[in-house]
Structure formats: C-alpha cells, structure tokens
Amino acid sequence: MVQKKPINRSLRGRFITFEGGEGAGKSTQIRLLAKRLEKARLRTLVTREPGGSPGAEAIRSALLAGIGKLIGGADAEALLFAAARDDHVRTLIEPALARGEWVLCDRFYDSTRAYQGKLGAVSLDLLNALQQVTIGDMKPDLTVILDIPVEIGLARAAVRRGSETPDRFESEAIDFHRGLREVFRQIAAQEPERCALIDANAEPEEVADRIWQAVRLRLLEPARAGAKSA
C-alpha cells in the first residue's frame, strides 16, 4: 500500500479543518477566520470537502445528488468520498501547505468518520484503508468542531437553502442528525490535542472570537515562541 510522504513541518503552512452538523455555521466562521489571518499577514486558502479541486467538485455534485445509494450504498459512497479527497489533497492542499499557506477546509476526514463510519454503516477497516491511501499520516493542525443543537442547526440550514431542494444529507431523519452531533462531540473528547469544541449557538462574531482564541493559543503563540528561540 502506498503511503504519503509527510510534508516538512518546519516549512509548511498550517491546516485547519472545520466540522459540525448541518447549519452549524462552518462557512461563515471560515470566512471570518480567513479575514483575521490575512490581517495578521498570513496567506490563506479556503477550500471544502467534498470538493475543492476540479475533480473533487465533479464528485461532490454526484454525491450530493445521492449517487452513492444508486450504485451500491454506503461502501460505494465512501469510495467516492475517498476519490474526491485524494484529488483534493494531492492537487490543492499539499501544494498550498508546502508554499507556507494556512489552509482552512470546510470538512475533512472527521466528517467521513461521522457520516460514513458511525452513521453510514461503513466498516472501520475500509475507512482506515481508504484514509491511509488518500492522506497517509497527515492530520490537521487544528480541527474546529462547531457544536449546535440539532433543531437550531437544521432551521438555519433551511433558511440558507431557501426554496432549493434539501441535499442528500439534509434530507436525513432527525435521529441521524442527533447521532451526527454526538459523534462529533465524541471525536472532540477523544482527541483534545487536535480538536477544539466550540459552542456555535451564539452570534457569529462571538463564535469567531472563540475560534480565534483557540487558533491563537494553539498555533500562533507556539509558532512565535519557536521563532524567537530559533
């Protein structure tokens, strides 16, 4: 099995992923964080999953239309997500990190663990194998998990969607979304060194301040301390 070579961490940028249920406010918070990072004179790249690169965006359209259910169910869907991630990481994320950019990504492999693993009935062995092929030992420097009551999140998503038809995941039953929230909370508890669980049931600016504090304490201040001691 092919293993990805790690990027030289002394030269690379930083990789921050955003996770959470529907309507948690990921897109808004990514935009607000990007503005703060750019104000701090840090080059940023905003992207998303599934998608981000031309090949992955094509797969995204098929996934959100529900093609996974048509061609084989949860396992087929997991394979499509893996194909999209491989293209995304290889053609967009890794080159940006190598250039020293800060990459902000709307969803990453934690969403795969939640949607396809815990709630999609895909075996852990298959997910681990796909993860090894697509990203190897690569991990985000920080994962922001936006936590919000399910009913509030779905109401926000409905307002955002307007008259458009709900996508493949927004159409799931309420119990699915409750389970999803619990999985993300479990991930945050299991990996506190990587994850910051943020209460997203507040005004966007207040949530943004909480995220900025996590970024500052976990990434910016350690980097500055390291630069001074070098």
Curated annotation (Swiss-Prot):
Keyword Zinc-finger: no
Entry binding sites for ATP: G20, G21, E22, G23, A24, G25, K26, S27
Cellular compartments per GO CC: cytosol
Coiled-coil residue windows: none
EC number: 2.7.4.9
Catalytic activity field: dTMP + ATP = dTDP + ADP
This protein's record includes keyword Coiled coil: no
UniProt record similarity statement: Belongs to the thymidylate kinase family.
Stated name of the protein: Thymidylate kinase
Species of the source: Rhodopseudomonas palustris (strain TIE-1)
Gene name linked to the record: tmk
